[in-house]
Structure formats: structure tokens, C-alpha cells
């Protein structure tokens, strides 16, 4: 028999002949679940989105002795990759293949349908594991804080995105798309995703969406949509826009649409471009060309035939959402006109001028917020993050964070990958220095799954998820789609537990 040598940076563990036969078989995957050694560092990750999986991936690759469990509130993994990435960006979802390899690694287990903070506490996880990593993302919405934001026809972008992407708690959203004009507040990538989807029922583009994993109810609603004009509003100027050039280029080239810009929003921009970093310069030049230059013959013809329009509106902040008389239905949004002041950083200042924009749909895309899942944890309610230093949670030894709960909802998936790797490196440094004591025997998932059973919670394993995955892909094949997502937790559990 060959005996494994498990190396870390400073320690050597040998599975020797003096151990019993049963101990020699620990670390082998049986029936889709890993059986682990009691003497190895045990780590659990809370959340199975990019932050959680990238942290797990780095730990498993860098520490051949670490044993890792991932806990997820929903029965299905992958978080924002499944529920946040736009359906017309399928290439971004390819990262799921890498995450699947991590989840199926012999030293990793996945436990879905476990609500940490309700089904099991952070302290209980700390008792069972040497280290706990919080990677549960940002489930809350930043509110506008203006009168009328609770009117019918006003939605958070997170909920709208969740609706067309199949997030279970958003399936009943049923947004009213019977109006002509929609206003999106915020100018990040999510705002532009929403704009593209709203303008989708056009010629061949709706046919393209039919080949994605957008949910069937959303596809049917969009096919009947009356939205013909989308305005994307930001409180600062073109040089401060938060989206990337890829998303702007997609808007410029969106079939059946034409841009509708205000030239005044771009006054003086050309003169300062020489001092702007190259990526920002290229993005701004594309906006300038779209807004100010006379299009060529082919582009002019395309714009003339367009039945829908979109445009950025800069230097505007929401003041109030207005209702139709004697109803609670949105009829317009009142915007304050801003000017920019530079005092170390660029900020928008009210001018006192306001304007009303007639619309029946308002979507607020001004940011997500992380939520506190355990009162024993520190939390910065203003920034909506867990206070940390390189992923080490303040005043909470052995507990770390990664992803948006660490940094706030910023950047793209690659940004989350880097910050998650940083957290994993911090943990490994602490293991090596002794700041994180991994010498004590910990029970890991053995005690947690027993505790959950006693509380009537039945976790979903990765093998169970693969049953759900199989059902979704088969349903999708029948419709010419990569998958047709199950839309309720009940449906998911029914499939997983059969």
C-alpha cells in the first residue's frame, strides 16, 4: 500500500502504518461525499458564489492538507454567476466549469439548502472548523431614499435581474412593461444589462434570447413589452460613468435601437481627454462619437429604421417618483440637475434646477448591500461590509471574508477572484505563523450535518445539485436553450431529494 505524504509550507503530515485501516481510508470520496481526516485543517466557506468558490479553489490548490466545506442558503450553487450574469453573456458563465471542478474535488464538500445564521450559527461553525470564511455576497438593495420609491412600477435592479435569471424569491415580481419609457437610475454594468434586456423584443434579438438561459416567463413578458425608450441616468458626468467599454459598445450596436444623447452633457469633455488614462479615454471617445458625430451612411440608415431608443442622462439625481392622479402607479420621475465640484474627488452638487421625465417604469440600479447574518459579527452599516484587513475580520480570530461582503459590490468577476485569493493567502499566512491554530482536532461537517438533521434541515449535496442540473438542461434542450431553470426552492428540493 502507498502511504500519502501531505505537505504544507512548514509542516509534514504522514499517514503512517500505526494508524488503523479505517483511518487510512479517510480522504477518499464515497458516494459523492468526501470522508476526511480528523487531523487536517478544516475550513468552511459560507456562500457558493464567485467569492466563495475562488477562496475554496485557492486554498485547495495551495494547501494539500486542507479540508473544505461550502455552505449555501439555496439548493443550487454558483450565486451571482447563475442569478446575476446577463443571459446574453453566456461566456461569462463558463467559470461554472472551474467551480464544478472545485466542488467535486476529493477534499471539498458542498452543502446547499443551509441558511447560516438561521439553521446554524457562526459560533457553531467556529466550534466545528479551524477557520470560517464568509462569502455570502450582497443580497440587499440600496434604496433611493426619495418619496414615491414604493410606487407600483418602481423596482430594484437586483430584483429585476433576479426575475429574468430565475432567482426563486423574485419569480413573482411580474414587472409592468406596458409603458413606453423606462428610466434606469445608475450607470454601471448592471444598469446596462437591464437596458439591453428591456430593449430585447426587437427583430432578431429576441430570437437570440430564446437560445439563452433566460427564464421562460421573463421571455414571454419581454416579447409583449411596450417599452420603446430607455434612459440611463447618472448623478455625475461622462468621465465618471461606472460601466465598462464592452457594455457601452453592446448598447451602441444593439439591433433595432438608436442612441438618444444630450450634446450639452458632453461639453468640454474632448479638451480634457488627453490627461485621462487610456481605458477611460477609449470609453469616453466611444460615447463622444455616439453622441456628437454625424453617423456614416450605413449607421444612419440603421438608426432611421430603429423602433426603439436609449440614452445616457448625466448630471441628474432622483428627487421624487410621481404617481398618476388618484393611483399608486408611476407616471414620472423628478430629477435634480447637478453640477460637478472637484475637492480631492469629483462630487455632484445640486443646482436647484429640476426636470420631470414621463415614464411608467423606474429601475434603481444604485448598488447592492451586504446584510449582517449574525449579530455576533462586526459590521459597517454605512459601507455595508464586514470590517476586515486583507480578509481577516476585525476582532474575530479564525473568521475571514471574501467577495462583496468584504469589498462592497464593485468590479467584475475577475476582481472578486483576486480579492478572494488575497483572503485565502491571508489565511494560509496565519496557519503558517501560528496566528491561526490548526493543531486542535475539529469535527467539521460531521458535527454540523448531525446538528442540521436534528433541526430538520436536509442539506443538498453536489450530487443532488447535479440531479437539478440534469433536469434543467433536459428541459432546456426541448426549447433549444442551454437550460430551463427551476424557479422555486420547492421544485429544486423535490428533484434533489428523489
Give the residues covered by each predicted segment.
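Dinucleotide-binding/catalytic capping subdomain of oxidoreductase cores
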Residues: 66-70, 92, 192-355, 427-439, ...
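N-terminal Rossmann-like FAD-binding beta1-loop-alpha1 element of flavoenzymes
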Residues: 42-65, 191-199
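C-terminal, flexible cofactor-proximal segment of oxidoreductases
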Residues: 396-498
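Short hydrophobic core segments
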Residues: 129-137, 183-185, 357-367
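N-terminal Rossmann-like dinucleotide/flavin-binding domain of flavoprotein oxidoreductases
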Residues: 75-131, 280-305, 311
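N-terminal mitochondrial targeting presequence
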Residues: 1-41, 498
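FAD-site-proximal beta/loop scaffold in flavoenzymes
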Residues: 153-171, 321-324, 341-407
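Glycine-rich dinucleotide-binding loop and its adjacent helix/turn
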Residues: 141-226, 382-392
Amino acid at each position: 500500500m502507498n502511504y500519502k505524504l501531505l505537505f504544507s509550507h512548514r509542516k509534514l503530515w504522514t499517514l503512517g502504518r500505526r494508524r488503523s485501516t479505517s483511518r487510512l481510508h479517510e480522504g477518499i470520496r464515497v458516494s459523492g461525499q468526501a470522508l476526511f481526516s480528523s487531523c487536517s485543517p478544516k475550513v468552511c466557506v459560507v456562500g457558493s458564489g464567485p467569492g466563495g468558490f475562488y477562496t475554496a479553489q485557492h486554498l485547495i490548490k495551495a494547501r494539500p492538507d486542507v479540508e473544505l466545506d461550502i455552505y449555501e442558503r439555496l439548493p443550487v450553487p454558483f450565486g451571482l454567476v447563475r442569478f446575476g450574469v446577463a443571459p446574453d453573456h453566456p461566456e461569462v458563465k463558463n467559470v461554472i466549469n472551474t467551480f464544478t471542478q472545485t466542488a467535486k474535488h476529493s477534499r471539498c464538500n458542498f452543502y446547499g439548502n443551509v441558511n447560516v445564521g438561521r439553521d446554524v450559527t457562526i459560533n457553531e461553525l467556529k466550534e466545528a472548523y479551524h477557520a470560517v470564511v464568509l462569502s455570502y455576497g450582497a443580497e440587499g438593495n440600496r434604496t433611493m431614499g426619495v418619496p414615491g420609491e414604493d410606487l407600483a412600477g418602481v423596482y430594484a435592479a437586483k430584483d429585476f435581474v433576479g426575475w429574468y435569471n430565475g432567482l426563486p424569491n423574485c419569480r413573482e415580481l411580474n414587472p409592468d412593461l406596458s409603458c413606453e419609457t423606462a428610466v434606469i437610475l445608475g450607470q454601471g454594468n448592471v444598469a446596462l444589462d437591464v437596458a439591453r434586456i428591456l430593449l430585447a423584443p426587437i427583430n432578431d434579438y429576441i430570437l437570440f434570447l430564446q437560445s439563452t438561459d433566460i427564464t421562460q416567463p421573463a421571455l414571454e413578458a419581454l416579447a409583449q413589452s411596450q417599452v420603446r425608450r430607455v434612459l440611463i441616468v447618472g448623478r455625475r458626468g461622462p468621465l465618471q460613468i461606472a460601466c465598462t467599454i464592452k457594455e457601452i459598445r453592446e448598447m451602441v450596436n444593439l439591433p433595432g435601437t438608436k442612441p438618444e444623447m444630450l450634446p450639452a452633457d458632453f461639453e468640454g469633455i474632448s479638451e480634457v481627454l488627453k490627461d485621462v488614462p487610456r481605458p477611460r479615454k477609449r470609453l469616453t471617445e466611444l460615447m463622444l462619437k455616439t453622441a456628437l458625430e454625424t453617423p456614416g451612411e450605413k449607421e444612419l440608415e440603421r438608426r432611421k429604421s430603429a423602433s426603439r431608443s436609449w440614452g445616457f442622462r448625466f448630471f441628474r439625481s432622483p428627487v421624487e417618483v410621481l404617481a398618476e392622479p388618484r393611483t399608486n402607479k408611476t407616471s414620472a420621475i423628478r430629477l435634480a440637475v447637478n453640477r460637478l465640484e472637484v475637492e480631492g474627488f469629483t462630487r455632484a452638487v445640486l443646482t436647484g434646477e429640476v426636470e420631470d421625465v414621463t415614464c411608467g417604469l423606474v429601475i434603481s440600479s444604485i448598488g447592492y448591500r451586504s446584510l449582517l447574518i449574525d449579530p455576533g459579527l462586526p459590521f459597517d452599516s454605512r459601507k455595508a461590509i464586514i470590517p476586515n484587513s486583507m480578509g481577516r475580520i476585525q476582532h474575530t480570530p479564525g473568521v475571514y471574508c471574501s467577495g462583496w461582503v468584504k469589498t462592497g459590490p464593485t468590479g467584475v468577476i475577475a476582481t472578486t477572484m483576486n480579492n478572494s485569493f488575497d483572503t485565502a493567502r491571508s489565511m494560509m499566512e496565519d496557519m503558517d505563523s501560528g496566528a491561526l491554530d490548526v493543531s486542535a482536532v475539529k469535527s467539521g461537517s460531521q458535527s454540523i450535518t448531525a446538528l442540521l438533521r436534528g433541526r430538520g434541515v436536509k442539506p443538498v449535496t453536489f450530487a443532488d445539485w447535479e440531479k437539478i442540473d440534469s433536469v434543467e438542461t433536459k428541459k432546456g434542450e426541448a426549447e433549444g436553450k442551454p437550460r430551463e431553470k427551476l424557479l422555486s426552492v420547492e421544485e429544486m428540493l423535490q428533484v434533489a431529494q428523489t
